[in-house]
């Protein structure tokens, strides 16, 4: 964290720390969690939010502890060395917005798939709904906004794009992302110690498949 990072207080027990990238957010969040001083630490895309015990810590002490934690030299942020390949069946009933995206962007089905699949991406964060993955690195030629009217229910495994990212639904739920496909990759396992397959910092690659 650099001296210029903005720190803001929200309410009596929340602090937000602005960062310059998702990678910096995850690194800072890991450092803060390691101290054991905080109730919860969440790394996002451009900020880290931490919750503290307002009875044990006043705001000045919290800010001082944050600076102490981050004053050491920052190591190089390394991405996960492994790439998780995620099979995606594009279009048809699996991607209800696929044809509309092709028409909007003046792309053939093959061109859209080629722009989305076969490239390495990085999971920026999980959020919105449990296990939902915000994945950075989307080709700028696939720039589309979110839906004006979000869907009440989206099938688990759905692959959406919007606002420069790919969104991956680990669980069914509402959502306004533009759906172009679906994966059969096991994104959620309730019996596992870590129930969600993806986490921030992981590298993924979408692979086009004809059927789920």
Regions flagged by a language model, labelled:
Residues 1-212:
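Glycine-rich active-site loops that engage anionic ligands at enzyme catalytic sites
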């Amino acid at each position: 964290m650099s001296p210029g990072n903005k720190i803001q207080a929200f309410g009596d027990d929340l602090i937000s720390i602005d960062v310059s990238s998702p990678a910096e957010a995850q690194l800072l969040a890991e450092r803060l969690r390691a101290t054991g001083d905080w109730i919860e630490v969440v790394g996002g895309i451009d900020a880290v939010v931490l919750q503290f015990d307002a009875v044990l810590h006043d705001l000045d002490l919290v800010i001082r502890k944050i600076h102490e934690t981050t004053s050491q030299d920052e190591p190089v942020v390394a991405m996960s060395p492994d790439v998780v390949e995620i099979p995606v069946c594009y279009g048809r009933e699996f991607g209800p917005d696929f044809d509309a995206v092709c028409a909007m962007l003046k792309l053939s089905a093959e061109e859209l798939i080629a722009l989305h699949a076969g490239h390495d991406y990085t999971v920026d964060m999980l959020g919105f709904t449990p296990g939902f993955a915000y994945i950075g690195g989307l080709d700028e030629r696939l720039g589309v906004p979110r839906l004006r009217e979000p869907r009440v229910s989206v099938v688990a495994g759905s692959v959406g794009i919007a606002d420069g990212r790919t969104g991956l639904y680990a669980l069914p739920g509402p959502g306004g992302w533009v759906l172009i496909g679906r994966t059969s990759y096991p994104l959620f396992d309730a019996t596992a110690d870590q129930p969600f397959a993806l986490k921030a910092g992981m590298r993924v690659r979408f692979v086009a498949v004809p059927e789920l």
